[in-house]
Each structure stands twice: as structure tokens, then as C-alpha cells.
Amino acid sequence: MGMRPGRKLDMVKRSFTILWARLPSIGAYLIVLGFIGIPAAAQEQASIMGRTDGGTYYLAAGSPYDRTVVRVRSPHEPGTIVIDTERRFLYLLQQDGTAIRYGVGVGRPGFEWAGIHRITSKAEWPDWHPPAEMRKRQPYLPVMMPGGPNNPLGARALYLGSTLYRIHGTSEPYTIGRAVSSGCIRMRNEDVEDLYSRVDIGTKVVVF
């Protein structure tokens, strides 16, 4: 005999009741209180991300790194981007105590970092200029690669402070959830396009 859909959703929500992380050196933390979903069986399986016209949030089905909405508690103001590099999630804090959560790829061992920056510029289908130290490690890289579907920066880029780091798309979506980059935060193209449309230059970004 199968489990009732509503009970299944309750179990999923309880499984993710309290997840939290903090970075004492900058006082950053974010507590995930749970997914926001609805019990109807058909909608329970729907891969619908975000808010519907009726104001209801849906639980995203599929990959654990699919875009979804979660309840959160954070000292940071709405509109802040908070990135949990250990769990490979990026959160965009909302006004109503929720956050849009996206899966990300992060820096590989030796290329991890943490801090607080602001978005200083934005670009659609950005060109890629691999820094000299990267080309020294990987001599086959070009000096410049024009923007496009094969460009490692993907569909959008959000540049962080005066650093070389960006939040950007990717031509390798299978790397989301992994630590493979040189320090940049990578997202699926459809996710970085969504995030790009929601944030402005000056947005605070907390990485821990």
C-alpha cells in the first residue's frame, strides 16, 4: 500500500527542518527552516520553481540542486545573496522570510575562499579572459574567448568587488554540486539568467 502524498511531503519537509552553517570570522549565518510546498500529489511531483500566480510555492522535484524556495532565518537583509560553499547552494533572500535556492559549483581544493563583496558589474554572454596565472597552469587556454554557448562563463556573469571572482553560468551543467572551479561560483545557465534578472549592481554577496 503506497504512502499518502501529503504524508510523503511532510516527511520530506521534516528531513530538511534545520540545516545551518556559519562563518564566525565574518559573523555570517543562514538557517534553512524547510522547503515550502503543497500536498497535492500531482503538484508534489511538478518541477515548478518559484511562486505561481496564486501565490503558492511548489516543491521542486528531481536533482537536489534544482532551483526551489526555502524558509530561512538570516541576519542579512532581503536581497542579499548568501552562498554556502560546503553544501553547494546559493540563496537569494526574499522579503517574506524565504529564499530562492540555487545549486552551484564552487572552487576546487586550494581555490576556496570566503568573504563579503558587492556586485560591481553584470554582463550577458560575457567574453572570457583567462587570467595569466590560469593560462600558465593551462597553456592551451586562449587569451580571450568570445561569449557564447561554449564559453565557460555561460549565459550571464555577476562580477564581485575588485576580485577576479564571478557568479556565472557554465557550459558544463553536470559540474553543479561539485568543487571544480578556480574560485568562481558557477550556476546552470537557466538559473544564472533567473538570478541575473532579480539582482542589481550593489547587491551584497556573502560567501562562506
Label the model's feature ranges.
Residues 1-21:
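N-terminal secretory signal peptides that target proteins for export/translocation
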Residues 22-37:
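Bacterial N-terminal signal peptides
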Residues 38-43:
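Sec/Tat signal peptide C-region and signal peptidase I cleavage site
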Residues 44-47, 55-170, 194:
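Gly/Pro-biased beta-strand-loop elements
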Residues 182-196:
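Short beta-strand-centered segments at strand-helix junctions
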